[in-house]
């Protein structure tokens, strides 16, 4: 929008979608492995991913962090145009620049995140990033209440959006790693689908709420409400996601015969192996 009008922008986006679809069709994908589940009912197949997700402590923590991220992203996506066009009286190009600040922060974080994750555990990175979202939203709520509309406010908004973009990317990007380590290969499609569905529930909560508050109350109220939701998600994630989160967990199977294939393959060298929820591990070890 800084160089072309929105008609050409949407046309270019449509061409991009078509090109993406053609590229997807050109790729040969490996045949997916069949699920090992003994229960083949429609209900079991439909809910398997969500059941695995909600029984895995680190993924319950991920869902809480996703709620915090949704609170921040909803404020940006829904209210940027309202703030820039209505409150500040600026142009479509200025809206694009404001959104670009958020996008630049997200991309910058994505570039440096792999090196960070090589040194710092996912949990610490994601929860710290969620805490930055809380601080950023709270600071913008306070600034919105004391700084009048004008260029100063816009410059502050650009910086705030960049910070939110960085923190959003760092809180959400590692989710694929968590999902991959939390399921067997045959259950990963269902688990990724569960993440898609549950994350959209978070957005379904925050998007309408932030729009109603921004339009019906004030932007300060919208910022404050999203900060409160992000704080709730961050604290919930801290509670649900154990600080000690090893891949391999010691456990036994008193219900299985001694010659069971799982015992021979996974427990031959000891009582621990990478632990995920499946038909042989229906509850998390140590769950109260």
What are the functions of these language-model segments?
Residues 55-75, 162:
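Pair of pore-lining "gating" transmembrane helices in MFS-fold secondary transporters
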Residues 240-288:
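Intrinsic disorder in cytosolic terminal tails and internal cytosolic loops
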Residues 30-64:
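Juxtamembrane intracellular "pre-TM" segments in multi-pass secondary transporters
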Residues 25-26, 72, 180:
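A structural signal for long alpha-helical coiled-coils and helix-turn connectors
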Residues 5, 10-17, 47, 54, ...:
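C-terminal transmembrane bundle of multi-pass solute transporters/carriers
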Residues 1-39:
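Cytosol/matrix-facing ends of alpha-helical transmembrane segments
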Residues 42, 73, 105:
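Charged, low-complexity surface patches
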């Amino acid at each position: 929008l800084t160089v072309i009008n929105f008609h050409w922008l949407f046309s270019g986006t449509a061409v991009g979608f078509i090109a993406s679809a053609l590229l997807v069709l050109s790729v040969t994908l490996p045949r997916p492995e069949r699920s090992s589940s003994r229960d083949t009912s429609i209900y079991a197949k439909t809910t398997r991913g969500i059941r695995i997700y909600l029984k895995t402590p680190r993924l319950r923590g991920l869902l809480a962090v996703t709620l915090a991220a949704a609170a921040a992203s909803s404020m940006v996506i829904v209210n940027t145009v309202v703030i820039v066009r209505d409150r500040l009286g600026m142009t479509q190009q200025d809206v694009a620049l404001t959104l670009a600040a958020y996008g630049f922060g997200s991309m910058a974080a994505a570039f440096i995140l792999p090196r960070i994750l090589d040194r710092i555990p996912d949990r610490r990175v994601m929860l710290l990033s969620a805490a930055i979202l809380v601080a950023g939203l709270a600071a913008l709520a306070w600034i919105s209440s004391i700084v009048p509309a004008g260029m100063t406010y816009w410059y502050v908004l650009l910086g705030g959006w960049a910070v939110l973009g960085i923190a959003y990317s760092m809180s959400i990007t590692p989710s694929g790693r968590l999902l991959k380590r939390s399921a067997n290969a045959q259950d990963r499609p269902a688990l990724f689908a569960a993440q898609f569905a549950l994350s959209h529930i978070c957005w379904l909560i925050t998007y309408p709420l932030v729009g109603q508050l921004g339009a019906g109350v004030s932007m300060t109220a919208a910022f404050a409400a999203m900060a409160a939701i992000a704080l709730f998600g961050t604290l919930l994630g801290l509670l649900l996601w154990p600080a000690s989160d090893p891949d391999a967990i010691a456990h036994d199977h008193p219900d299985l015969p001694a010659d069971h294939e799982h015992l021979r393959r996974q427990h031959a060298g000891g009582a621990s192996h990478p632990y995920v929820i499946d038909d042989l591990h229906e509850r998390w070890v140590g769950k109260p």
